[in-house]
Amino acid sequence: MALSPRESAVRRAQRTRTRLKALSNGRPRLSVFRSSKNIYAQVIDDERGVTLASASTLEGEAATKGADKDAAALVGKLVAERAIEKGVKDVVFDRGGYIFHGRVKALADAAREAGLNF
């Protein structure tokens, strides 16, 4: 039986997360969620089950930008700055099943430029 688009997306995200768990070596995960109108990023410590830092296009300067590449880059910069304040510099990038292109790539590049290593 064919999977619905939603079920396919959930499976892709789970497959990505399983691979990341094997590669992470205890590093926190920079998780990205992309909707049609916003983009969200969280730095998550999976061992403790705690979100260390987060940012989205719903807050601050990014709220006026919408969900384009510029807004995604701003979110990447914000989440990187907040993670570094908490003492986190090394993370594993969890693209959540999304293709590494466009807004997801812009967020990742901005986070790298702001000082996160992945």
Curated annotation (Swiss-Prot):
- Gene Ontology biological-process entries: translation
Q: Does the keyword section mention Cell membrane?
A: no
Database matches in InterPro entries: Ribosomal_uL18_bac-type, Ribosomal_uL18_bac/euk
Gene Ontology annotations for the cellular component aspect, listed alphabetically = cytosolic large ribosomal subunit
What SUPFAM superfamilies does the database record attribute to this sequence?
Translational machinery components (SSF53137)
Q: Which residues form the signal peptide?
A: none
A Pfam family annotated for this chain is Ribosomal_L18p
The SS bond pairs are: none
Which GO terms of the molecular function aspect are on file? 5S rRNA binding; structural constituent of ribosome
Keywords for this protein: Ribonucleoprotein, Ribosomal protein, RNA-binding, rRNA-binding
What is known about what this protein does?
This is one of the proteins that bind and probably mediate the attachment of the 5S RNA into the large ribosomal subunit, where it forms part of the central protuberance.
Subunit comment: Part of the 50S ribosomal subunit; part of the 5S rRNA/L5/L18/L25 subcomplex. Contacts the 5S and 23S rRNAs.
The record's listing under PANTHER family reads: 39S RIBOSOMAL PROTEIN L18, MITOCHONDRIAL, LARGE RIBOSOMAL SUBUNIT PROTEIN UL18M
Q: Which HAMAP family match?
A: Ribosomal_uL18_B
Query: What does the sequence similarity comment in the record state about its family?
Result: Belongs to the universal ribosomal protein uL18 family.
Q: How is this protein named in the record?
A: Large ribosomal subunit protein uL18
Species this protein is from: Caulobacter sp. (strain K31)
Gene this chain is encoded by:
rplR
